[in-house]
Swiss-Prot record:
Oligomerizes as a right-handed, spiral filament on DNA at oriC. Residues 105-121 have a biased composition (Low complexity). Residues 72-199 are annotated as: Domain II. Plays an essential role in the initiation and regulation of chromosomal replication. ATP-DnaA binds to the origin of replication (oriC) to initiate formation of the DNA replication initiation complex once per cell cycle. Binds the DnaA box (a 9 base pair repeat at the origin) and separates the double-stranded (ds)DNA. Forms a right-handed helical filament on oriC DNA; dsDNA binds to the exterior of the filament while single-stranded (ss)DNA is stabiized in the filament's interior. Keywords: ATP-binding, Cytoplasm, DNA replication, DNA-binding, Lipid-binding, Nucleotide-binding. GO terms for biological process: DNA replication initiation; regulation of DNA replication. Pfam families: Bac_DnaA (PF00308), Bac_DnaA_C (PF08299), DnaA_N (PF11638), Hda_lid (PF22688). The gene is dnaA. The keyword Glycosyltransferase does not apply. PROSITE patterns: DNAA. ATP binds at residues 244, 246-248. This is Chromosomal replication initiator protein DnaA. Residues 417-536 are annotated as: Domain IV, binds dsDNA.
Length: 536
C-alpha cells in the first residue's frame, strides 16, 4: 500500500503544478487496503480537501491503482484530521521534479518586518530551486505579517463568531495586499484551509467542472472576466435564472479562481438569508460597527438569492452601504436572483439602480445537447460509464434544471446497483417511472396555449384561428415553440392542436423563435418568464 502511494504521489507530482500537488495531494495518506474487496482507503485531513480530491483526482488515482495492482481498485476517501499532522511532521521525500525556470517573484508590500523577522525579499540561497524559494518567501511573508499584527485592521474573533463573521487576521489583511506568486500559497496548507473556511466557498465548484452550453455561455464568459479582473469588469455582476441552473456554481467558481490567483484575498460567499440573520443579530447586540467593518473590508462579496431581501428594509439599507463601500474600494460584488432585478418585488429602488449599473446576465434552462453533456460528465465523476443513448433519453424527458438531471441520474445508478443490472434505456424507464409520469402530466399544449394567450392578452381561440395579424401570429409562434420545447409532442401533433396546421408551419415557427431568442434580449426574457410560469 505504501509502495503504491509513493509511486502514485511521484507520478502526480510530475503531472501537477507545484501549487496543486502541495495543496491537494501531499496532505493525503493511504490508511487501509483490502485485498479481498480490492478497496483502497485514502485519508484527507479536512472536508474541503476530501471533497476537492474526490471530485478532481479520484479517477486518476483509481487508474494508477489499477495499473499498479493489475486489477480494478475501488478508491475510497475518508476523513482523518491526524493525517495533516503526520504530513506536517515530515514524510519521506519523493523523487524530485525536473528543474524549473527561475522564478521572479513580485516584492511583498505588507510593510517592513521588525528586526529578527525573515526578509521576504532576500535572495534565495545558492542551489535552492524556484519552488523551494517561493515557499521560503511565503513563510517569510507570513512571519512579517504576524509581526505587524498590532497595526492590522481586523474584527475581534469572538465578536465575529457571534455574527458568523470570520475574523480577519493580520496575516490575511497583509496577504490580501500582496502580489500573488505561483507556488507561494502552497507553503502553508493550513492557511489555505483557513481561507476556504472563512470564505465559505465550496472548493468543488470550479470553472473546470462547469458544463457550458448556449444556455449559460454568456454567464460563464462574464464570470471568467470578473475572476480575471475583479472590481474592474462588470461591477456588480448580477446573474439570474431559475432553480438549479448553475448560478451558485458559477459564483463559487469565481471565488475559487480568485482564491487560487490571490490566496490572501478577503472573500465571502453568503446566502441572502444568512446576511439577513447577521443584520438582525448585529441590531440585537448593537454590533453594527463590527458588522460594517467586516463586510466593508472584503475584496469579493458573493451574495446568493438576493430576492430574500424583499420587504426587509433594514437589511437593504445595510447592504446598500456595504455595496457603496465595496464598489468605491474597487472590490467586486456578485449577486444572484431567481428573476430579473427590476422584477424583484419589495426591493428599494436605490438597490435596483445599483444592480443595473453593472452587467445583468440570464442563465437559461439547459438545451438538449447541454443536458446530455451534464449527464455524461456527472456519470464520469461517479466512475460510471453511461451510454449516449441513455443520456439522450433522460435529457429528452427532463428539461427543467441541472439538479433534476443529477437527481435522476442518482436514481438510475442506485436502481442499477440494487438490481445488479446494466444501465439501459429499459432500466432507466423503470427507475424513473414516477418522475416521467409526473413530467408528462405537468405541461400540456393546452396549458401552454392558455398561458401564452394570457401573457400577451389575446384569446385562447386565437391560437387555433387562421387570423394572421402580428399581435396574434407572434404569440401563436411562441406557443408552438414552447410546445416543442416543453412537451413530447411531435410536429404534426402540435400542428393539429393549433387548428390543424401543417407540421412545416410548426417547424418554421420553432426555428424562427429559436433564432430570434439568441438575438433579442426582450424576447429571451419573455420566454424565460413563460417557461418558469409553466414549470411552476
Amino acid at each position: 500500500m505504501n509502495d503504491f502511494w509513493q509511486h502514485c504521489s511521484a507520478l502526480l507530482e510530475r503531472e501537477l503544478t507545484p501549487q496543486q500537488y502541495v495543496t491537494w495531494i501531499k496532505p493525503l495518506a493511504p490508511v487501509a487496503f483490502d485485498a479481498a474487496a480490492n478497496t483502497l482507503s485514502i485519508a484527507a485531513p479536512n472536508r474541503f480537501k476530501l471533497d476537492w480530491v474526490k471530485s478532481q483526482f479520484s479517477g486518476r488515482i483509481s487508474d494508477l491503482a489499477r495499473d499498479f495492482w493489475n486489477a480494478p481498485i475501488e478508491v475510497q476517501f475518508v476523513l482523518d484530521p491526524k493525517v495533516g499532522q503526520r504530513s506536517a511532521a515530515g514524510a519521506a521525500p519523493l523523487a524530485p521534479r525536473a528543474p524549473l525556470p527561475a522564478a521572479n517573484p513580485a516584492p511583498v508590500t505588507a510593510g517592513p518586518a521588525p528586526s529578527g523577522a525573515a526578509d521576504a525579499n532576500a535572495p534565495a540561497p545558492a542551489g535552492m530551486n524556484a519552488a523551494t524559494a517561493a515557499a521560503v518567501a511565503a513563510v517569510a511573508a507570513a512571519q512579517a505579517a504576524q509581526a505587524a499584527q498590532a497595526n492590522a485592521a481586523a474584527l475581534n474573533a469572538d465578536e465575529a463568531a457571534d455574527l458568523d463573521l470570520p475574523s480577519l487576521t493580520a496575516h490575511e489583511a497583509a496577504a490580501g495586499r500582496r502580489t500573488w506568486r505561483p507556488g507561494a500559497a502552497s507553503a502553508n496548507s493550513e492557511a489555505a484551509d483557513s481561507m476556504y473556511e472563512r470564505s465559505k466557498l465550496n472548493p468543488v465548484l470550479t470553472f473546470d467542472n462547469f458544463v457550458t452550453g448556449k444556455a449559460n455561455q454568456l454567464a460563464r464568459a462574464a464570470a471568467i472576466q470578473v475572476a480575471d479582473n475583479p472590481g474592474i469588469s462588470y461591477n456588480p455582476l448580477f446573474l439570474y435564472g431559475g432553480v438549479g441552473l448553475g448560478k451558485t456554481h458559477l459564483i463559487h467558481a469565481i471565488g475559487n479562481q480568485l482564491l487560487l490567483d490571490k490566496p490572501g484575498a478577503r472573500i465571502r460567499y453568503i446566502h441572502a438569508e444568512q446576511y439577513v440573520s447577521d443584520v438582525v443579530k448585529a441590531y440585537q447586540r448593537k454590533a453594527f460597527d463590527d458588522f460594517k467593518r467586516y463586510y466593508h473590508s472584503l475584496d469579493l462579496l458573493l451574495i446568493d438569492d438576493i430576492q430574500f431581501f424583499s420587504g426587509k428594509s433594514r437589511t437593504q439599507e445595510e447592504f446598500f452601504y456595504a455595496f457603496e463601500a465595496l464598489v468605491a474600494n474597487k472590490a467586486q460584488v456578485i449577486i444572484t436572483s431567481d428573476t430579473y432585478p427590476k422584477e424583484i418585488s419589495g426591493i428599494d429602488d436605490r438597490l435596483i439602480s445599483r444592480f443595473d449599473s453593472g452587467l445583468t446576465v440570464a442563465i437559461e434552462p439547459p438545451e438538449l445537447e447541454m443536458r446530455v453533456a451534464i449527464l455524461m460528465r456527472k456519470a464520469q465523476s461517479e466512475g460510471v460509464s453511461l451510454s449516449e443513448d441513455v443520456a439522450f433519453f433522460v435529457a429528452k424527458h427532463l428539461r427543467s434544471n441541472v439538479r433534476e438531471l443529477e437527481g435522476a441520474l442518482r436514481k438510475i445508478l442506485a436502481y442499477s446497483k440494487f438490481h445488479g443490472r446494466e444501465i439501459t434505456i429499459e432500466l432507466t424507464k423503470e427507475a424513473l417511472k414516477d418522475l416521467l409520469t409526473v413530467q408528462n402530466r405537468q405541461i400540456s399544449v393546452e396549458n401552454i396555449q392558455k398561458t401564452v394567450a394570457d401573457f400577451y392578452n389575446i384569446k385562447v381561440a386565437d391560437m387555433y384561428s387562421k387570423k394572421r395579424p402580428a399581435n396574434i401570429a407572434r404569440p401563436r409562434q411562441i406557443a408552438m415553440y414552447l410546445a416543442k420545447e416543453l412537451t413530447q409532442k411531435s410536429l404534426p401533433e402540435i400542428g393539429e392542436l393549433f387548428g390543424g396546421r401543417d407540421h412545416t408551419t410548426v417547424l418554421h415557427a420553432v426555428r424562427k423563435i429559436a433564432d430570434e431568442r439568441g438575438k433579442d434580449a426582450q424576447l429571451n426574457h419573455e420566454l424565460h418568464v413563460l417557461e418558469q410560469t409553466l414549470k411552476g
